[in-house]
Amino acid sequence: MSLATDCPSSLASASERPLLSQVQLARAAAQHTATLPTAIKNAALEAMATALLEHQEPILAANRADLERAAEMVKAGELSASAYARLKLDAHKLADMVAGVRQVIRLGDPVGRALLIRELDEGLILERRTYPLGVLGVIFESRPDALVQIAALAVKTGNSVLLKGGSEALLSCQALMAAIQAGLQQIPEFPQGSLQLLTSRAEVKALLQLEGLVDLIIPRGSSSFVRYILENTRIPVLGHADGLCHLYVDRAADVDMAIKLTVDSKTQYPAACNAIETLLVHKAIAPHFLPLAVKALREKGVELRGDPLCRELVPDLIPATEDDWSTEYADLILSIKVVGSLDEAIAHIQQYGSRHTEAIVTEDAAAARRFLDEVDAAGVFHNASTRFADGFRYGFGAEVGISTQKLPPRGPVGLEGLVTYRYQLRGQGHLVADYTGPQARPFQHRDRLNNTGLA
């Protein structure tokens, strides 16, 4: 039966039929890539990496054209400065993208792994093995580098993916996809149709309605953008709506370390979802720490907003409002609050945080342990910048996004988050009837997989 026949009639409107054809091609490709040998997938990834380097000039030229158009959008108020910053590519960023692809090559293949091997009875063996999800729909704003990260992870995990970047990144995405496709064409065993680029909002709207045909939607972008996706599809969604991160400077913090971590967590890349938006400072260390931190942050061009206790110590801070505690600036703006205790810091984070990434700076091991154990977030750090919350930095090779939901996968989602599992049962004519009733044969339930994952 064809996919178009399986699809509800309401989804098969004339405007959606071209997309259905693309999804059909993607599903057919996914059946093939699901069983590709690791060597073929790695060869495809190396071909992608090589092609990206060979196509550097047209990629950067396309990006410059996007930036020119995006600059006018910023002037017109149609695009934020942070989105403009995420759009920019250069030779260094392209080299990082290629390094990310090659790191994925070095990672183990997540497909076909045995998670469980159990002998239910003699000759009756149950296995739980990893398998690709199938067809992914990934929609992202700005950040054309996301296209390369996602494509690499899709290839390694044997998934097909339909990618849609923001209109402001259209030319960049087209140039990147052209390079990737040129590379994949060098690997005859790799099926066409596994990586596809969508280019219109109408396609996104139609994609969100393809429940049963698309297995997972992954949005990457602003909180309003992610909320739109969540509210307009019944397909499972993996992602986060906000990146409202905090750094708490404890009373026992090393001041020099705390200043460096504050500056790095805010200014290293302020448009990133793992940059801090609020700095919490214990009242015992605030008189010493705050003036120094304010000076260091202002040298980086950060606009600072403080609560009344902060402004007693640094009077020229902009007064912080209630809205500031729940705002993801994604810009060189930081709110600062003085707290009376670790308990108050944790309570503030639990009330206003987005469960993305939270950090404490302290030399008190007990305070650090409490913070790590009690703060509910996908990433909880001690004496480390929140900017480490990233799939590449975690050694995942790349990430398709960061999930703040409680159910797994959580945090930066790399290879392991793009596979599911199947139960495979091998018997020798075993019947359930033999295991029921007064003369029931007992199960043995002997595990054959040790703690290392080896049989």
Curated annotation (Swiss-Prot):
It is an enzyme of class 1 (oxidoreductase). InterPro entries: Ald_DH/histidinol_DH, Ald_DH_C, Ald_DH_N, Aldehyde_DH_dom, G-glutamylP_reductase_CS, Glu-5-SA_DH, GPR_dom. SUPFAM superfamilies: ALDH-like. Its EC number is 1.2.1.41. One of its GO terms (cellular component) is cytoplasm. Pathway: Amino-acid biosynthesis; L-proline biosynthesis; L-glutamate 5-semialdehyde from L-glutamate: step 2/2. Keywords: Amino-acid biosynthesis, Cytoplasm, NADP, Oxidoreductase, Proline biosynthesis. Belongs to the gamma-glutamyl phosphate reductase family. HAMAP family: ProA. NCBIfam families: PRK00197.1, proA. Catalyzes the NADPH-dependent reduction of L-glutamate 5-phosphate into L-glutamate 5-semialdehyde and phosphate. The product spontaneously undergoes cyclization to form 1-pyrroline-5-carboxylate. This is Gamma-glutamyl phosphate reductase. It comes from Synechococcus sp. (strain JA-2-3B'a(2-13)) (Cyanobacteria bacterium Yellowstone B-Prime). The gene is proA.
